[in-house]
């Protein structure tokens, strides 16, 4: 803390002691090109009153034509940061990848993997190191009613109505893949009376009817904080209730849609823990590289843990296009590892942290699956001994 204060004080001194540049003391670009152009007239030597002082300050702070020409030459827009070597992506491919993509097209289903341009798409769809292919299915259409500054999903105030056959189609598709763990997510649907929670719950229930042994994670929107919507999904038969806070508390308005906020998201996670059956895990995710400080990350982690959240993931924010907010910094793998260790120390049951990690990252699902099965085993043992 003292070090940061000392740095801030030294920067302040440097700024206040920097010589000001006035129009009269700096040659303009026109004077450089043509010496015959007269210099701007200096301000009056002594003009009484506040008006004179205001004029003097404005003239002292004003940029010269040379300054203006320089700003036009170099541009005023911030240049995007170059990607470091640890952010290189792999090219999607493989038989499993092709099969999943073909099935999705056949049933006209959407995945957040594609819509959000996830860098792990190739690894997850092809099976990766675990050999189990994973896709995060996006329901309620492909058009969101919100417009977060980081997200590449299409937006509209009046998206098309949900497909009534979608819950059945999604359940049949997932059941046919032979997966053990699936993530179902959705766009925000503020246009619907129940925010789409009934559609979400129906999808989970139909899938459970076809594949009772399948583990289901639901990555849900905030439902505007409506307790009835949260309860409907939390009691639908899922194993993991996930809702992302996306960024630290201080940057919520800069990163997320104005209808989302930190308290509302924390309340949703708390309600899910309250409504869901015992043993249901809660999970959230934070993007790094949005302009947050380490102190803000730690403070946010503490509040998330206090809400009873079991699993947290950290990943690097990647700018989907030039229309979206720029990357503030590329956080190093070493920093991600420190956040992981700190999360474990705080009591999170599982922490996935790395530049390429996303909230639905398959490595996280692999370990969460093991956690759920371990909890089931303990419950069975306890029932047998009772």
Swiss-Prot record:
[4Fe-4S] cluster 1 binds at residues 113, 118, 124, 360. One of its GO terms (cellular component) is mitochondrial matrix. Residues 37-46 have a biased composition (Pro residues). GO terms for molecular function: 4 iron, 4 sulfur cluster binding; lipoate synthase activity; metal ion binding. InterPro entries: Aldolase_TIM, Elp3/MiaA/NifB-like_rSAM, LIAS_N, Lipoyl_synth, Lipoyl_synth_mt, rSAM. Residues 1-48 are annotated as: Disordered. SUPFAM superfamilies: Radical SAM enzymes. [4Fe-4S] cluster 2 binds at residues 144, 148, 151. One of its GO terms (biological process) is lipoate biosynthetic process. Its cofactor is [4Fe-4S] cluster. It is found in: Mitochondrion. Binds 2 [4Fe-4S] clusters per subunit. One cluster is coordinated with 3 cysteines and an exchangeable S-adenosyl-L-methionine. Pathway: Protein modification; protein lipoylation via endogenous pathway; protein N(6)-(lipoyl)lysine from octanoyl-[acyl-carrier-protein]: step 2/2. Residues 129-349 form the Radical SAM core domain. Residues 13-34 have a biased composition (Polar residues). Keywords: 4Fe-4S, Iron, Iron-sulfur, Metal-binding, Mitochondrion, S-adenosyl-L-methionine, Transferase. It catalyses: [[Fe-S] cluster scaffold protein carrying a second [4Fe-4S](2+) cluster] + N(6)-octanoyl-L-lysyl-[protein] + 2 oxidized [2Fe-2S]-[ferredoxin] + 2 S-adenosyl-L-methionine + 4 H(+) = [[Fe-S] cluster scaffold protein] + N(6)-[(R)-dihydrolipoyl]-L-lysyl-[protein] + 4 Fe(3+) + 2 hydrogen sulfide + 2 5'-deoxyadenosine + 2 L-methionine + 2 reduced [2Fe-2S]-[ferredoxin]. This protein may be expected to contain an N-terminal transit peptide but none has been predicted. This is Lipoyl synthase, mitochondrial. It comes from Sorghum bicolor (Sorghum).
């Amino acid at each position: 803390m003292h070090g940061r204060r000392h740095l801030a004080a030294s920067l302040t001194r440097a700024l206040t002691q920097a010589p000001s540049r006035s129009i009269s003391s700096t040659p303009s670009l026109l004077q450089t090109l043509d010496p015959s152009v007269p210099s701007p007239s200096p301000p009056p030597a002594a003009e009484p009153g506040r008006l004179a002082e205001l004029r003097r300050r404005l003239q002292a702070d004003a940029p010269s034509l040379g300054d203006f020409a320089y700003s036009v030459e170099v541009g005023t827009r911030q240049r995007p940061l170059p990607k470091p070597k640890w952010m290189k992506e792999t090219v999607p491919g493989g038989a499993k990848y092709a099969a999943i993509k073909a099935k999705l097209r056949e049933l006209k289903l959407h995945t957040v993997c594609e819509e959000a341009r996830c860098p792990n798409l190739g690894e997850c769809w092809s099976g990766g190191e675990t050999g189990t292919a994973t896709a995060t299915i996006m329901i309620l259409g492909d058009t969101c009613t919100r417009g977060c500054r980081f997200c590449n999903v299409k937006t509209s105030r009046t998206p098309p109505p949900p497909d009534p056959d979608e819950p059945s189609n999604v359940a049949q598709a997932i059941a046919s893949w032979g997966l053990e763990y699936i993530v179902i997510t959705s766009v925000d649907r503020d246009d619907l009376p129940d925010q789409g929670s009934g559609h979400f719950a129906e999808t989970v229930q139909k899938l459970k009817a076809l594949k009772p042994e399948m583990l289901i994670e639901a990555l849900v929107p905030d439902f505007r904080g409506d307790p009835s919507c949260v309860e409907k999904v939390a009691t639908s038969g899922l194993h993991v209730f996930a809702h992302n806070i996306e960024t630290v508390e201080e940057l919520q308005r800069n990163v997320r849609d104005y209808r989302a906020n930190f308290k509302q998201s924390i309340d949703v996670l708390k309600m899910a823990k309250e409504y869901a059956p015992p043993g249901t895990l809660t999970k959230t995710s934070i993007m790094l590289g949005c302009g947050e400080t380490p102190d803000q990350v730690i403070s946010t982690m503490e509040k998330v843990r206090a809400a009873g959240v079991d699993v947290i993931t950290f990943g690097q924010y990647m700018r989907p296009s030039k229309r979206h907010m720029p990357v503030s910094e590329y956080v190093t793998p070493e920093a991600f590892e420190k956040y992981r260790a700190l999360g474990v120390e705080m009591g999170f049951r599982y922490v996935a942290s790395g530049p390429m990690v996303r909230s639905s990252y398959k490595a996280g699902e692999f370990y969460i699956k093991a956690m759920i099965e371990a909890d089931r085993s303990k419950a069975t043992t306890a029932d047998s001994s009772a």
